[in-house]
Amino acid sequence: MTKVAINGFGRIGRLVARAILSRPDCGLELVAINDLGDAKANALLFKRDSVHGNWPGEVSSEGSDLIVDGKRIAVTAERDPANLPHAAHGVEIALECTGFFTDKESAGKHIAAGAKRVLISAPAKGVDLTVVYGVNHDKLTAEHTIVSNASCTTNCLAPIAKVLNDAIGIERGLMTTVHSYTNDQKILDQIHPDMRRARAAAMSMIPTTTGAARAVGEVMPELKGKLDGSAIRVPTPNVSVVDLTFTPKRDTTRDEVNAALKAASESGPLKGILQYVTDPLVSIDFNGDRHSSSVDSLETAVLEGKLVRVLSWYDNEWGFSNRMVDTAGVIAGLL
């Protein structure tokens, strides 16, 4: 078992912990958590999740430690990752989930503290590799020390972009993610650097920015500069959907597009990552779904063979958290 620590016990940090602890075959052992929150509060928030339900086992705190089903996990409250006791706990991979240390230099503080590798749960600057599991995780090597797991939206978009670029080619495309609100927004109107995110999250549809489409170019260099997009935050707490429209390099049909996506979901590196859906579902149906991307085949459209539209759902919390675990597992195998 490879020992890992989580820095930041917020929405993603807690769900990464749930994913590790609920997947005994993942090869990872969670030995430490760093978070500035109170131990009792963290225990309660881990056990009782408004979106994903209760943890089925026992959760408590003792001193500063978290105890889950009898397993004791050391908890610290350090602001600077360089001061974390990674060496003392034998931590090999630091899972950086605060959302603050999102460049190679700042994330590298985990290495200074004794970790061997760092996986960042967000897009990051200057890192050794940006990974979307199922698309380019096979590019990971032992030389990649600080890695980004991209964003939840890039993890949804990249698999379908990969399949369709291989099958029919993508000349250029635009994506819109209709995205559930997140903690970056305000419950009621309040100052925020983005004046649209400053508005009450549960009362409006809120247009905002996303770099998810452009980030596909970091994962698939052949698509660099060919995709862009935007986001609309909506008043739901979880589950989002990517709406991709693109011009193919050759004429195609709806059946060909769906056939390519269906085949990729059934075998190869995207099996278990990409899901092909034939039922008329809605967002709540994907709450708790581990797939990165669930193609809504009923929504696929092709206009005159020259314009393609694809819709794909994703649990922006649970799916992404499981990809953190999957990518960390690949990194562990390279240590």
Predicted regions and their residues:
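Short, solvent-exposed beta-strand edge segments and adjacent coil->beta transition regions
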Residues: 1, 143-144, 200-202, 239-243, ...
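N-terminal Rossmann-like NAD(P) cofactor-binding subdomain of oxidoreductases
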Residues: 1-198, 326, 334-335
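Generic structural signal for well-ordered, non-membrane alpha-helical segments
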Residues: 9, 13, 103, 150-153, ...
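Predominant activation on well-ordered alpha-helical scaffold segments within soluble catalytic domains
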Residues: 13, 17, 108, 158-165, ...
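Glycine-rich beta-alpha junction loops
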Residues: 36-38, 124-125, 151-153, 177-184, ...
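Short, flexible turn/loop "capping" segments at secondary-structure junctions
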Residues: 139-141, 197, 234-240, 302-305
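Acidic, glycine-rich segments within the central catalytic cores of soluble metabolic enzymes
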Residues: 166, 170-237
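C-terminal active-site/capping subdomain that shapes the small-molecule cofactor and substrate pocket
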Residues: 229, 241, 245-335
